Amino acid sequence: MKKLTKTNAHRQQKLASIINEVLIEILRRGKMLDIRLFNCPLAITKVIVTADLKIANCYFLPFNTKLTIDDIMDALNNSKNAIRNFVTNKINMKFSPEIRFHYDHGFDNAIKVEKLLKNISLKRRDKDK
């Protein structure tokens, strides 16, 4: 495994930023995508590139859609090669990273934490009465 240096970390961040921009552009235009994604607004929440620059883990969050997370994952994975080719054309590197999509559980986790905190607060209020 490649050692993480300051220069390499900068390259990771730069590549992640470029991939994020390209994904947003592709999703906005709807080019080269599985037909199920046309009426499925997605937010790319983050892109994390591995130290060796070979894998880009892309996290998404769907908005107001009838599709399940599994359907969205399947549609994104069907579009993966076209997306990778588009990324390759936008970056100036010998190799384009493999793109992997993941559902971003951060929003769901934040809602759960908020509910837990609210329950604790209510229990404290009830105890104080």
Curated annotation (Swiss-Prot):
Main location per the UniProt record: cytoplasm
Q: Which domain of life is it from?
A: Bacteria
The places in or outside the cell where this protein is found are: Cytoplasm
Gene Ontology MF terms: ribosomal small subunit binding
What the entry lists under InterPro entries is as follows:
KH_dom-like_a/b, RbfA, RbfA_dom_sf, Ribosome-bd_factorA_CS
| Keyword Cytoplasm found | yes
Which PROSITE patterns does the protein's record reference? RBFA
Alphabetical list of Pfam families matching this protein? RBFA (PF02033)
One cellular component term from this protein's GO annotations in UniProt:
cytosol
User: Which residue ranges traverse the bilayer?
Assistant: none
Record-level GO BP terms: maturation of SSU-rRNA
Function text:
One of several proteins that assist in the late maturation steps of the functional core of the 30S ribosomal subunit. Associates with free 30S ribosomal subunits (but not with 30S subunits that are part of 70S ribosomes or polysomes). Required for efficient processing of 16S rRNA. May interact with the 5'-terminal helix region of 16S rRNA.
Family membership: Belongs to the RbfA family.
Q: Which NCBIfam families match?
A: PRK00521.2-2, rbfA
Database matches in PANTHER family: RIBOSOME-BINDING FACTOR A, CHLOROPLASTIC-RELATED
- What does the record note on quaternary structure? Monomer. Binds 30S ribosomal subunits, but not 50S ribosomal subunits or 70S ribosomes.
Q: What is this protein called?
A: Ribosome-binding factor A
Protein source organism: Rickettsia canadensis (strain McKiel)
What taxonomic classification does the UniProt entry list for its organism? Bacteria, Pseudomonadati, Pseudomonadota, Alphaproteobacteria, Rickettsiales
Gene giving rise to this polypeptide: rbfA
